[in-house]
Protein backbone atom coordinates (compact mmCIF):
# COMPACT_ATOMS: atom_id res chain seq x y z
CA UNK A 1 0.00 0.00 0.00
CA UNK A 2 1.28 3.45 -0.87
CA UNK A 3 1.04 6.12 1.79
CA UNK A 4 1.84 9.76 1.19
CA UNK A 5 3.98 11.52 3.74
CA UNK A 6 2.64 15.07 3.95
CA UNK A 7 4.21 16.59 7.01
CA UNK A 8 3.54 20.20 6.09
CA UNK A 9 1.71 23.31 6.05
CA UNK A 10 -1.66 25.59 5.46
CA UNK A 11 -4.39 26.85 10.11
CA UNK A 12 -7.27 25.74 11.90
CA UNK A 13 -8.00 26.19 15.54
CA UNK A 14 -10.99 23.93 15.73
CA UNK A 15 -13.67 22.35 13.61
CA UNK A 16 -15.49 25.48 12.57
CA UNK A 17 -13.15 27.26 10.26
CA UNK A 18 -9.71 28.69 10.82
CA UNK A 19 -6.21 28.44 9.49
CA UNK A 20 -3.97 25.81 8.12
CA UNK A 21 -0.76 24.01 8.76
CA UNK A 22 0.43 26.02 11.67
CA UNK A 23 -0.64 28.81 9.42
CA UNK A 24 1.46 27.27 6.72
CA UNK A 25 4.48 28.73 8.45
CA UNK A 26 6.56 25.56 8.59
CA UNK A 27 6.32 24.76 4.91
CA UNK A 28 6.74 28.30 3.70
CA UNK A 29 9.64 29.10 5.97
CA UNK A 30 11.40 25.85 5.06
CA UNK A 31 11.03 26.73 1.39
CA UNK A 32 11.90 30.41 1.68
CA UNK A 33 15.62 30.25 0.90
CA UNK A 34 15.38 27.79 -2.00
CA UNK A 35 12.56 29.80 -3.55
CA UNK A 36 14.66 32.93 -3.40
CA UNK A 37 17.31 31.08 -5.38
CA UNK A 38 14.98 29.50 -7.94
CA UNK A 39 11.56 30.87 -8.74
CA UNK A 40 10.01 27.58 -9.84
CA UNK A 41 10.61 23.97 -10.76
CA UNK A 42 11.76 22.91 -7.31
CA UNK A 43 11.05 19.78 -5.37
CA UNK A 44 9.34 17.75 -8.06
CA UNK A 45 9.35 14.01 -7.59
CA UNK A 46 11.67 12.32 -10.05
CA UNK A 47 10.16 10.16 -12.78
CA UNK A 48 11.23 6.69 -11.79
CA UNK A 49 9.29 4.97 -14.54
CA UNK A 50 7.42 2.98 -11.87
CA UNK A 51 3.65 3.02 -12.18
CA UNK A 52 3.47 4.08 -8.54
CA UNK A 53 5.09 7.38 -9.47
CA UNK A 54 2.48 10.12 -9.92
CA UNK A 55 4.32 11.47 -12.92
CA UNK A 56 5.34 8.24 -14.61
CA UNK A 57 2.59 8.58 -17.23
CA UNK A 58 2.70 12.37 -17.32
CA UNK A 59 -0.44 12.44 -15.20
CA UNK A 60 -1.41 12.46 -11.56
CA UNK A 61 -4.98 11.26 -12.02
CA UNK A 62 -4.44 7.52 -12.49
CA UNK A 63 -2.13 7.43 -9.49
CA UNK A 64 -4.46 9.54 -7.34
CA UNK A 65 -7.41 7.20 -7.85
CA UNK A 66 -5.62 4.50 -5.87
CA UNK A 67 -3.72 6.77 -3.53
CA UNK A 68 -4.05 6.11 0.18
CA UNK A 69 -3.13 8.89 2.58
CA UNK A 70 -1.99 8.15 6.10
CA UNK A 71 -3.33 10.63 8.63
CA UNK A 72 -1.98 10.72 12.16
CA UNK A 73 -4.89 11.10 14.59
CA UNK A 74 -3.15 12.86 17.44
CA UNK A 75 -5.74 12.34 20.16
CA UNK A 76 -5.96 8.61 19.42
CA UNK A 77 -2.24 8.20 18.79
CA UNK A 78 -2.93 6.12 15.69
CA UNK A 79 -2.87 6.39 11.92
CA UNK A 80 -5.93 6.28 9.69
CA UNK A 81 -5.36 5.47 6.03
CA UNK A 82 -7.95 6.81 3.59
CA UNK A 83 -8.28 7.42 -0.17
CA UNK A 84 -7.29 10.88 -1.36
CA UNK A 85 -10.82 12.12 -2.04
CA UNK A 86 -12.06 10.86 1.32
CA UNK A 87 -9.22 12.75 2.92
CA UNK A 88 -10.41 15.89 1.13
CA UNK A 89 -13.91 15.26 2.51
CA UNK A 90 -12.55 15.01 6.04
CA UNK A 91 -10.56 18.22 5.60
CA UNK A 92 -13.54 20.19 4.28
CA UNK A 93 -15.57 18.90 7.25
CA UNK A 94 -12.81 20.02 9.60
CA UNK A 95 -12.02 23.33 7.98
CA UNK A 96 -15.35 24.86 6.95
CA UNK A 97 -18.91 24.81 8.34
CA UNK A 98 -20.96 22.33 6.30
CA UNK A 99 -23.85 24.77 6.02
CA UNK A 100 -21.74 27.25 4.04
CA UNK A 101 -22.80 27.88 0.45
CA UNK A 102 -22.02 25.07 -1.99
CA UNK A 103 -19.63 27.17 -4.08
CA UNK A 104 -17.67 28.11 -0.95
CA UNK A 105 -17.44 24.43 -0.02
CA UNK A 106 -16.19 23.69 -3.52
CA UNK A 107 -13.53 26.39 -3.24
CA UNK A 108 -12.43 24.87 0.07
CA UNK A 109 -12.28 21.39 -1.46
CA UNK A 110 -10.11 22.64 -4.31
CA UNK A 111 -7.78 24.40 -1.86
CA UNK A 112 -7.51 21.27 0.32
CA UNK A 113 -6.77 19.08 -2.68
CA UNK A 114 -4.19 21.55 -3.95
CA UNK A 115 -2.41 21.27 -0.61
CA UNK A 116 -2.15 17.50 -0.92
CA UNK A 117 -1.05 17.52 -4.54
CA UNK A 118 1.58 20.20 -3.90
CA UNK A 119 3.06 18.24 -1.01
CA UNK A 120 2.90 15.00 -2.95
CA UNK A 121 4.92 16.45 -5.79
CA UNK A 122 7.40 18.05 -3.40
CA UNK A 123 7.68 15.31 -0.79
CA UNK A 124 7.14 12.17 -2.82
CA UNK A 125 6.12 8.85 -1.28
CA UNK A 126 7.07 7.52 2.12
CA UNK A 127 6.26 4.68 4.45
CA UNK A 128 5.86 7.26 7.21
CA UNK A 129 2.28 8.58 7.40
CA UNK A 130 3.03 11.97 8.89
CA UNK A 131 -0.03 14.00 7.96
CA UNK A 132 -1.52 15.32 11.18
CA UNK A 133 -5.23 15.85 11.73
CA UNK A 134 -4.47 19.18 13.42
CA UNK A 135 -3.56 22.69 12.34
CA UNK A 136 0.02 21.49 11.89
CA UNK A 137 -1.29 20.37 8.50
CA UNK A 138 -4.98 20.65 7.67
CA UNK A 139 -7.67 19.84 10.21
CA UNK A 140 -9.07 16.44 9.31
CA UNK A 141 -12.16 14.83 10.86
CA UNK A 142 -12.64 11.06 10.46
CA UNK A 143 -15.98 10.66 8.71
CA UNK A 144 -17.35 8.25 11.31
CA UNK A 145 -16.97 10.97 13.95
CA UNK A 146 -18.97 13.65 12.20
CA UNK A 147 -22.29 12.75 13.82
CA UNK A 148 -20.71 13.16 17.26
CA UNK A 149 -18.91 16.31 16.17
CA UNK A 150 -21.88 18.10 14.66
CA UNK A 151 -24.26 16.81 17.33
CA UNK A 152 -27.39 18.05 15.60
CA UNK A 153 -28.68 14.88 13.95
CA UNK A 154 -27.86 16.26 10.51
CA UNK A 155 -24.56 14.50 9.88
CA UNK A 156 -25.92 12.54 6.91
CA UNK A 157 -27.25 15.69 5.25
CA UNK A 158 -24.08 17.68 5.92
CA UNK A 159 -21.79 14.90 4.75
CA UNK A 160 -23.84 14.66 1.55
CA UNK A 161 -23.26 18.38 0.91
CA UNK A 162 -19.54 18.03 1.52
CA UNK A 163 -19.43 14.94 -0.67
CA UNK A 164 -21.16 16.86 -3.45
CA UNK A 165 -18.61 19.67 -3.21
CA UNK A 166 -15.71 17.22 -3.35
CA UNK A 167 -17.15 15.11 -6.16
CA UNK A 168 -18.01 18.10 -8.32
CA UNK A 169 -14.44 19.40 -8.01
CA UNK A 170 -12.70 16.04 -8.35
CA UNK A 171 -9.15 16.34 -9.73
CA UNK A 172 -9.28 20.16 -9.70
CA UNK A 173 -6.38 22.09 -8.18
CA UNK A 174 -5.13 25.68 -8.16
CA UNK A 175 -1.98 26.41 -10.14
CA UNK A 176 0.34 29.32 -10.82
CA UNK A 177 2.49 29.01 -13.92
CA UNK A 178 1.65 25.33 -14.11
CA UNK A 179 2.50 24.36 -10.54
CA UNK A 180 0.20 23.80 -7.54
CA UNK A 181 0.11 26.82 -5.27
CA UNK A 182 0.48 27.17 -1.54
CA UNK A 183 -3.29 27.43 -1.10
CA UNK A 184 -3.32 29.26 2.23
CA UNK A 185 -6.67 30.05 3.82
CA UNK A 186 -8.03 31.33 7.11
CA UNK A 187 -11.31 32.05 8.85
CA UNK A 188 -11.99 35.78 8.93
CA UNK A 189 -10.25 38.91 7.67
CA UNK A 190 -10.04 42.34 9.24
CA UNK A 191 -11.32 43.74 5.95
CA UNK A 192 -8.24 42.82 3.91
CA UNK A 193 -6.08 39.79 3.27
CA UNK A 194 -2.31 39.90 3.72
CA UNK A 195 0.63 39.74 1.36
CA UNK A 196 2.43 36.50 2.16
CA UNK A 197 5.72 38.26 2.97
CA UNK A 198 4.02 40.35 5.64
CA UNK A 199 3.36 37.22 7.69
CA UNK A 200 5.88 34.61 6.51
CA UNK A 201 8.74 36.71 5.10
CA UNK A 202 8.28 35.01 1.74
CA UNK A 203 6.75 36.86 -1.21
CA UNK A 204 4.57 34.62 -3.35
CA UNK A 205 3.04 36.38 -6.36
CA UNK A 206 -0.35 34.72 -5.99
CA UNK A 207 -0.76 35.56 -2.28
CA UNK A 208 -1.46 39.29 -2.54
CA UNK A 209 -3.52 41.56 -0.31
CA UNK A 210 -7.11 42.11 -1.48
CA UNK A 211 -10.13 43.74 0.14
CA UNK A 212 -12.52 41.39 1.94
CA UNK A 213 -15.21 43.71 3.33
CA UNK A 214 -17.87 41.06 3.91
CA UNK A 215 -16.24 39.49 6.96
CA UNK A 216 -17.10 42.35 9.31
CA UNK A 217 -20.81 42.00 8.69
CA UNK A 218 -21.06 38.22 8.44
CA UNK A 219 -18.44 36.48 10.56
CA UNK A 220 -19.07 35.84 14.26
CA UNK A 221 -15.28 35.72 14.62
CA UNK A 222 -14.63 39.20 13.31
CA UNK A 223 -14.09 40.88 16.70
CA UNK A 224 -12.94 39.63 20.09
CA UNK A 225 -11.83 41.41 23.25
CA UNK A 226 -9.59 39.81 25.86
CA UNK A 227 -8.08 41.12 29.08
CA UNK A 228 -4.66 40.29 30.50
CA UNK A 229 -3.14 41.27 33.80
CA UNK A 230 0.01 43.36 33.62
CA UNK A 231 1.98 40.48 35.10
CA UNK A 232 0.69 37.97 32.58
CA UNK A 233 1.32 40.28 29.63
CA UNK A 234 4.90 40.97 30.72
CA UNK A 235 5.57 37.29 31.30
CA UNK A 236 4.25 36.21 27.91
CA UNK A 237 6.10 38.97 26.09
CA UNK A 238 9.34 38.32 27.97
CA UNK A 239 9.48 41.83 29.44
CA UNK A 240 11.04 42.91 32.72
CA UNK A 241 8.52 43.01 35.54
CA UNK A 242 8.74 46.78 35.82
CA UNK A 243 8.62 47.43 32.05
CA UNK A 244 5.99 49.81 30.76
CA UNK A 245 3.14 48.37 28.73
CA UNK A 246 2.19 51.27 26.50
CA UNK A 247 2.10 50.16 22.86
CA UNK A 248 3.26 52.20 19.87
CA UNK A 249 2.59 50.87 16.39
CA UNK A 250 5.59 51.73 14.19
CA UNK A 251 4.40 50.20 10.91
CA UNK A 252 1.43 48.46 9.35
CA UNK A 253 1.07 45.94 6.55
CA UNK A 254 -0.78 46.55 3.32
CA UNK A 255 -3.59 44.50 4.86
CA UNK A 256 -3.79 47.01 7.76
CA UNK A 257 -2.47 44.60 10.37
CA UNK A 258 0.30 45.49 12.77
CA UNK A 259 3.68 44.88 11.19
CA UNK A 260 5.97 46.32 13.88
CA UNK A 261 5.23 47.61 17.35
CA UNK A 262 7.10 48.82 20.43
CA UNK A 263 6.06 47.59 23.88
CA UNK A 264 8.06 48.12 27.05
CA UNK A 265 11.03 49.46 25.13
CA UNK A 266 11.23 46.38 22.90
CA UNK A 267 10.38 45.90 19.25
CA UNK A 268 8.04 43.11 18.18
CA UNK A 269 6.39 42.06 14.95
CA UNK A 270 2.62 41.92 14.97
CA UNK A 271 2.87 38.18 14.43
CA UNK A 272 5.12 37.81 17.48
CA UNK A 273 2.63 39.60 19.71
CA UNK A 274 -0.22 37.55 18.29
CA UNK A 275 1.55 34.25 18.93
CA UNK A 276 3.00 35.14 22.34
CA UNK A 277 -0.36 36.36 23.66
CA UNK A 278 -2.52 33.82 21.82
CA UNK A 279 -4.49 36.46 19.92
CA UNK A 280 -6.88 35.65 17.10
CA UNK A 281 -5.26 38.15 14.72
CA UNK A 282 -2.35 40.53 14.29
CA UNK A 283 -4.89 43.31 13.69
CA UNK A 284 -5.57 44.62 17.19
CA UNK A 285 -5.92 47.60 19.48
CA UNK A 286 -4.40 47.80 22.97
CA UNK A 287 -5.59 49.77 25.97
CA UNK A 288 -3.71 49.83 29.28
CA UNK A 289 -5.70 50.40 32.47
CA UNK A 290 -4.66 50.34 36.11
CA UNK A 291 -5.02 46.58 36.54
CA UNK A 292 -5.11 45.00 33.11
CA UNK A 293 -4.62 45.37 29.37
CA UNK A 294 -7.66 45.18 27.12
CA UNK A 295 -6.89 43.88 23.63
CA UNK A 296 -9.46 43.87 20.82
CA UNK A 297 -8.65 41.81 17.74
CA UNK A 298 -10.19 42.14 14.30
CA UNK A 299 -10.38 39.01 12.17
CA UNK A 300 -9.39 35.43 12.93
CA UNK A 301 -6.31 33.83 11.44
CA UNK A 302 -3.08 34.75 9.70
CA UNK A 303 -4.91 36.63 6.96
CA UNK A 304 -3.06 35.13 3.98
CA UNK A 305 -4.95 33.68 1.02
CA UNK A 306 -8.65 32.86 1.03
CA UNK A 307 -10.95 34.20 3.73
CA UNK A 308 -13.51 31.48 4.36
CA UNK A 309 -16.21 33.88 5.51
CA UNK A 310 -15.42 36.09 2.56
CA UNK A 311 -15.69 33.08 0.27
CA UNK A 312 -19.11 32.29 1.70
CA UNK A 313 -20.23 35.88 1.14
CA UNK A 314 -19.10 35.77 -2.48
CA UNK A 315 -20.95 32.49 -2.95
CA UNK A 316 -24.10 34.11 -1.55
CA UNK A 317 -23.69 36.79 -4.21
CA UNK A 318 -23.77 34.12 -6.89
CA UNK A 319 -20.05 33.71 -7.49
CA UNK A 320 -18.76 30.28 -8.49
CA UNK A 321 -15.88 28.46 -6.82
CA UNK A 322 -13.54 29.46 -9.64
CA UNK A 323 -14.54 33.12 -9.17
CA UNK A 324 -13.86 32.91 -5.43
CA UNK A 325 -10.46 31.36 -6.02
CA UNK A 326 -9.58 33.93 -8.68
CA UNK A 327 -10.50 36.72 -6.26
CA UNK A 328 -8.38 35.57 -3.32
CA UNK A 329 -5.44 34.07 -5.24
CA UNK A 330 -3.86 36.39 -7.82
CA UNK A 331 -3.26 35.27 -11.42
CA UNK A 332 -3.95 31.60 -10.77
CA UNK A 333 -5.78 28.94 -12.74
CA UNK A 334 -8.09 26.15 -11.69
CA UNK A 335 -7.24 23.10 -13.74
CA UNK A 336 -7.11 19.33 -13.76
CA UNK A 337 -4.28 17.80 -11.76
CA UNK A 338 -3.86 15.38 -14.66
CA UNK A 339 -2.65 18.31 -16.78
CA UNK A 340 0.37 18.93 -14.58
CA UNK A 341 3.60 18.68 -16.58
CA UNK A 342 5.55 15.46 -16.51
CA UNK A 343 8.29 15.47 -13.87
CA UNK A 344 11.86 15.60 -15.06
Regions found by a protein language model. Give the residues of each.
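Conserved, single-site charged/polar hotspot
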Residues: 1-344
Amino acid sequence: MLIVCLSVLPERMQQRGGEQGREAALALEQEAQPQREAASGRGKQRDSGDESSPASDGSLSAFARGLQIGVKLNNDNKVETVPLEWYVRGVVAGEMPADFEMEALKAQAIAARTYVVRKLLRSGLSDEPLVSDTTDDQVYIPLERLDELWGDGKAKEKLARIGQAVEQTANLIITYKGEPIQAAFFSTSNGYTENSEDYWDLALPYLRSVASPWDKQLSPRYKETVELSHTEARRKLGLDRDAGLAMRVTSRTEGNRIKEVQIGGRNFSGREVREKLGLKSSSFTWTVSRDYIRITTYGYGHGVGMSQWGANALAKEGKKAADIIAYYYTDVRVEQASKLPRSS
